[in-house]
Swiss-Prot record:
<comment type="similarity">
    <text>Belongs to the frataxin family.</text>
</comment>
<dbReference type="GO" id="GO:0016226">
    <property type="term" value="P:iron-sulfur cluster assembly"/>
</dbReference>
<dbReference type="GO" id="GO:0005737">
    <property type="term" value="C:cytoplasm"/>
</dbReference>
<dbReference type="InterPro" id="IPR002908">
    <property type="entry name" value="Frataxin/CyaY"/>
</dbReference>
<comment type="function">
    <text>Involved in iron-sulfur (Fe-S) cluster assembly. May act as a regulator of Fe-S biogenesis.</text>
</comment>
<dbReference type="InterPro" id="IPR047584">
    <property type="entry name" value="CyaY"/>
</dbReference>
<keyword id="KW-0479">Metal-binding</keyword>
<dbReference type="GO" id="GO:0008199">
    <property type="term" value="F:ferric iron binding"/>
</dbReference>
<protein>
    <recommendedName>
        <fullName>Iron-sulfur cluster assembly protein CyaY</fullName>
    </recommendedName>
</protein>
<dbReference type="InterPro" id="IPR020895">
    <property type="entry name" value="Frataxin_CS"/>
</dbReference>
<keyword id="KW-0408">Iron</keyword>
<dbReference type="Pfam" id="PF01491">
    <property type="entry name" value="Frataxin_Cyay"/>
</dbReference>
<dbReference type="InterPro" id="IPR036524">
    <property type="entry name" value="Frataxin/CyaY_sf"/>
</dbReference>
Length: 109
């Protein structure tokens, strides 16, 4: 994948995360605060815990830091998959957000 392809796919992912935060706030009482700064999105939950998603352009990876740990994702041609086998990005984000929010939350691309 070229740098341009990575940035195109990665920007789409960050936009989808932002849009999911807006949708979740419109349809639940989760009260997520999603803040975008350059190539990073920080999601802050009501309990002040955070999930941070950021681009690692030199590695063509997206990193996610949650209370449960750190995750690295690479695009496999179809989806962003965890480099250590923990699954697809939006499934991992939904799982970690659910744990940190204390209620079921679904992030989608």
């Amino acid at each position: 994948m070229t740098d341009l392809e990575f940035m195109d796919r990665a920007e789409k992912l960050l936009l989808a995360v932002e849009q999911s935060c807006d949708r979740i706030n419109d349809t639940t009482d989760a009260d997520l605060d999603g803040q975008r700064t350059g190539g990073m999105v920080t999601i802050t939950f009501r309990n002040r815990s955070q999930i941070v998603i950021n681009l690692q352009k030199p590695l063509h990876e997206i990193w996610m830091a949650a209370q449960s740990g750190g995750y690295h994702f690479r695009h496999d041609g179809t989806s962003w998959m965890d480099t250590k086998g923990a699954g697809e990005f939006f499934a991992a984000l939904s799982h970690n957000a659910t744990l940190q929010a204390g209620q079921a939350l679904q992030f989608t691309d």
